[in-house]
């Protein structure tokens, strides 16, 4: 289903660029995704139930997503027709990836032993921006007591580990190799 999700996301992304509504589309799709996530199991059951014909699924889209822009709603209708409403979170994740790529930004998770101040997060963010070449990072601070000290940052698929836990693990590996 990941390939299908990427195709929907790509089509919506290209339409958003063509119609110059990328930011609006992202905001509305994020709101739709936020509404769908707690009801994902119900949506999956409804979507896969053979008793629910396409008209029923389209009625659900019409009533549940009033007020969203026509391009997003049209994609939801196509997804309903093809019984793909259950992959909506995957489609949003793929769309979000394209959106972030367009703006040269990404999400970063910064793990630390204690909560970092905004000033500390800004400094870490600046260092990560220099190392990754991105224009912007959306940073989330997560407390992880197992790090002992230091920080570990994840940006996309890259991990920057400056934790004491990592230092100790590297020392341990060196000892094992020299035995």
Swiss-Prot record:
What gene is it encoded by? atpH
Q: Which Gene3D superfamilies match?
A: N-terminal domain of the delta subunit of the F1F0-ATP synthase
* Superkingdom as given in the UniProt entry: Bacteria
Task: List locations, semicolon-separated.
Answer: Cell membrane
**GO cellular component entries:** plasma membrane; proton-transporting ATP synthase complex
Function of the protein: F(1)F(0) ATP synthase produces ATP from ADP in the presence of a proton or sodium gradient. F-type ATPases consist of two structural domains, F(1) containing the extramembraneous catalytic core and F(0) containing the membrane proton channel, linked together by a central stalk and a peripheral stalk. During catalysis, ATP synthesis in the catalytic domain of F(1) is coupled via a rotary mechanism of the central stalk subunits to proton translocation. This protein is part of the stalk that links CF(0) to CF(1). It either transmits conformational changes from CF(0) to CF(1) or is implicated in proton conduction.
Q: PANTHER family from the entry?
A: ATP SYNTHASE DELTA CHAIN
- NCBIfam families in alphabetical order: ATP_synt_delta (TIGR01145), PRK05758.1-1 (NF004399)
Subunit and interaction comment: F-type ATPases have 2 components, F(1) - the catalytic core - and F(0) - the membrane proton channel. F(1) has five subunits: alpha(3), beta(3), gamma(1), delta(1), epsilon(1). F(0) has three main subunits: a(1), b(2) and c(10-14). The alpha and beta chains form an alternating ring which encloses part of the gamma chain. F(1) is attached to F(0) by a central stalk formed by the gamma and epsilon chains, while a peripheral stalk is formed by the delta and b chains.
Q: What is its main location?
A: membrane
Q: Can you say what this protein is called?
A: ATP synthase subunit delta
Q: Is-annotated flag, keyword Ion transport?
A: yes
